[in-house]
């Protein structure tokens, strides 16, 4: 990957991330409150659906930029060593590495954002200060493991499926795809990936919102999933799946469509 491609991926990824996170923030708030242990209405219901948006705004650009720079760089490195049949494996590896890097930026902003969403009467700044006072800087990374373990399976489904759908559409029309077509493929791939990984998203939300020192806050994903299963059953494991699928399908359309458009413009 040369400098021009690097810059294009950086800017396109950052712009795409900002577009999605700010446009669809209310759906994300509703999803978080549906998944919280205290329940939807106690967590704020439909009140203050933009609570936590400053945290999302700060983290969106660098988070998405870090993902796509890593994703495109990894694809570029392995492109000369793999055949067409092995392309999905390259996409899976690239997406996994991208998520590991991006989560270093995403998790602290996600922790603050979700705690503010679940406590809309408290400002983002106050939530940040409280988190630092109670748990220190390390507390901002609570849920890093659960976030990575949610994002990697998600990306293992979304990005190979996105690339596959684009390739099929490209072959059928015998030429280059428009950005809106890449966006449609992104919406379909994102919706499928969002639904199948909802239980992991529920576990991540419980871990991030748990009080410091509790067993849930320890970050043991299998234990948290069992706790959700025992207390709420299958509906609990898929709590928030409808807004999550809606959010990520629309997000996939905007995110991947905007990414393709901006990147092609810069190249």
UniProtKB/Swiss-Prot annotation:
Keyword Transcription: no
Coiled coil: none
Job of this protein: Mitochondrial S-adenosyl-L-methionine/S-adenosyl-L-homocysteine antiporter. Mediates the exchange of cytosolic S-adenosyl-L-methionine, the predominant methyl-group donor for macromolecule methylation processes, for mitochondrial S-adenosylhomocysteine(SAH), a by-product of methylation reactions.
Subcellular localization(s) per the UniProt record: Mitochondrion inner membrane
Record's catalysed reaction(s): S-adenosyl-L-homocysteine(out) + S-adenosyl-L-methionine(in) = S-adenosyl-L-homocysteine(in) + S-adenosyl-L-methionine(out)
Keyword annotations of the record: Antiport, Membrane, Mitochondrion, Mitochondrion inner membrane, Repeat, S-adenosyl-L-methionine, Transmembrane, Transmembrane helix, Transport
GO biological process: mitochondrial S-adenosyl-L-methionine transmembrane transport; S-adenosyl-L-methionine transport
Record membrane topology: Multi-pass membrane protein
InterPro entries cross-referenced by the UniProt entry: Mitochondrial_sb/sol_carrier (IPR018108), Mt_carrier_dom_sf (IPR023395)
Swiss-Prot/TrEMBL Solcar repeat ranges: 4-77, 86-168, 177-265
Organism expressing this protein natively: Danio rerio (Zebrafish)
Gene Ontology annotations for the cellular component aspect, listed alphabetically: mitochondrial inner membrane; mitochondrion
Gene Ontology MF term list: S-adenosyl-L-methionine transmembrane transporter activity; S-adenosyl-L-methionine:S-adenosyl-L-homocysteine antiporter activity
Transmembrane segments: 5-25, 49-69, 85-105, 142-162, 182-202, 238-258
Main location (coarse class): mitochondrion
Protein family per UniProt: Belongs to the mitochondrial carrier (TC 2.A.29) family.
Name of the featured protein: Mitochondrial S-adenosylmethionine carrier protein
Stored PANTHER family: S-ADENOSYLMETHIONINE MITOCHONDRIAL CARRIER PROTEIN
